[in-house]
A protein has these predicted regions:
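Sec-dependent signal peptide recognition
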Residues: 2-9
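C-terminal motif of bacterial Sec signal peptides marking the signal peptidase cleavage site
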Residues: 15-16
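Surface-exposed loop/turn elements that mediate protein-protein interactions on large endomembrane-trafficking
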Residues: 20-42, 73-89, 121-140, 173-183
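Signature of short aromatic-glycine-proline-rich micro-motifs recurring in repeat-based ectodomains
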Residues: 44-51, 97-101, 145-149
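Short beta-strand elements that form the blades of beta-propeller/WD-repeat-like
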Residues: 58-67, 103-115, 121, 150-169, ...
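Asp-box/WD-like beta-propeller blade repeats and closely related beta-sheet repeat scaffolds
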Residues: 124-166
Length: 183
């Protein structure tokens, strides 16, 4: 009996002390390569919400939000050309209001944050409103989905920062949303 316990102990110790890392380290290296993207006259070049999105086929897009016209632009990262854009409706049955920030899970699941509302909207590439998730108990505040603080999804939970109005409110500075239970 003692041998079984000792064997289990060493097996547990061996597994827990494994040097295998689930995620490898990455390193950025400076290159002489320049990425240049042409923008049209309707697009402001002072955007602060941007990210890189890789689709299921491995194609990479540089994405950014044009706050002025409620649009998310997708540029082919390799060809450095506009690929497509999505412009969610602000009003109506598919309305999401004025967006400020987004998280692209895939082109059928694009989460957008409303600038004036404490909630999260789920749309697809065609801008169909699929779901709305209000953040109960929070006053309307500005969600801070900026390039320096993008929403992050880990398994079934989406984490994002918000900018509470500390002068008059006591809202939290971040929100975690379980995408399955919507809590």
């Amino acid at each position: 009996m003692k041998k079984h316990h000792l064997l289990l102990f060493f097996l547990f110790l061996f597994i827990s002390c494994s040097t295998h890392k689930k995620y490898g380290a990455c390193e950025l290296k400076e290159t002489d390569e320049t990425l240049s993207f042409p923008i049209d006259s309707d697009t402001k070049n002072n955007f602060n919400i941007y990210s890189v999105y890789k689709d299921k086929d491995g194609k990479e897009y540089f994405t950014f939000q044009n706050i002025e016209n409620n649009t998310i632009h997708f540029y082919d990262l390799k060809q450095q050309k506009p690929a497509f854009r999505i412009t969610p409706s602000q009003e109506g049955s598919n309305g999401v209001g004025r967006i400020f920030g987004y998280y692209i899970q895939n082109l059928d699941s694009i989460y957008v944050f409303n600038f004036y509302d404490s909630g999260l909207y789920l749309i697809n590439k065609n801008c169909d409103l699929l779901d709305k998730q209000p953040f109960l108990g929070l006053k309307p505040s500005c969600f801070m989905a900026t390039a320096s603080q993008l929403p992050v999804r880990i398994e079934h939970t989406l984490y994002t920062c918000i900018e509470p109005n500390r002068l008059i409110e006591h809202d939290p500075v971040s929100v975690a949303i379980n995408m399955n239970t919507k809590e």
